[in-house]
Amino acid sequence: SIPFVNLISLDLLKFFFGVKLYALLAGSKSLGNSKLSFIKKNSDKVLSNNYKLELSFFDGVMDDTLLGKDLIKQAKQLDIDIFENHEISSFDINGKVDEQNFDNIILAVGPWTKILLQKNNIKSLRDIDYIKGSHLILNKQIKSGIMFTGICNSRYIFALPFKGLTLLGTTEERVESPENPSIDLSEESYLLESFNSILKNPITKKDILSSYSGVRPLIKEGTNSHKASRDFFIQKNKRLISIFGGKWTTAPSIARKIVTIINNE
């Protein structure tokens, strides 16, 4: 749900019509109806008494680790050879990987695309912003997810029920490298302060059970990381196809485009 302090606001109207449009576009595949309701002050809600309305809506939750393992399982059932933890020293645009030759090479390596192209002396047509996102696992139970603005008001934060605990995130920090991301103290403070700004009963650092971080490969478009492109770009150099950007939700679209590129050769 999205909580609101004011009974009427531009944000309220924007999100109300936004979730209704999503439901309309989803048609019969909609997960459920959205609802705007008053928040009762004496209810067992976790929110502070400042909030008067909440917009409830349904969304899906994805376990990317389990999905990845399931995709590997499906690939093996189709007799696709998968080599994990297998080091590759070099590749080129003519389909050569180390000492072997292939019809096509698809470079789908997330934030490492530009790095590996440069390592193999291949010009990268796009620059990448390495944007770190960090999450906290809190020793707190909530009945449903909450979407709210952080204390800087530049992006939204989600607090989601997670295996009897709460998953809180995410941050958006530009980093120099995608290697070994981890949460820093400023991110931790930002998430805690943001969450406490809407809670009836504040939490402390003692409620943090664990944390994790990842790096998103966003196509660079300026100095403001918030305006970096969430889209993807496919670069083709002869038999080498390189993917810039993208995410789980755009993976099917990327796959279809790559199949089209290969079939049209």
Model feature map: region roles:
Residues L107-K123:
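Flavin (primarily FAD) binding-site architecture
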Residues L125-S134, L138-I142, M147-L167, E173-E265:
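C-terminal catalytic lobe of FAD-dependent flavoproteins
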Residues Q74, N85-H86, G150, S197:
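Flavin (primarily FAD) cofactor-binding/catalytic cores of flavoenzymes
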Residues S1-D44:
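Dinucleotide-binding Rossmann-like beta1-alpha1 core, especially the glycine-rich loop
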Residues I39-L78, T171-P178, N237-G245:
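Helix-loop-beta segment of a Rossmann-like dinucleotide-binding subdomain
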Residues D98-N104, A108:
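Core beta-strand elements of the Rossmann-like FAD/NAD(P) dinucleotide-binding domain
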Residues D81-K96:
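A conserved short coil-to-beta-strand element within the FAD-binding core of flavoproteins
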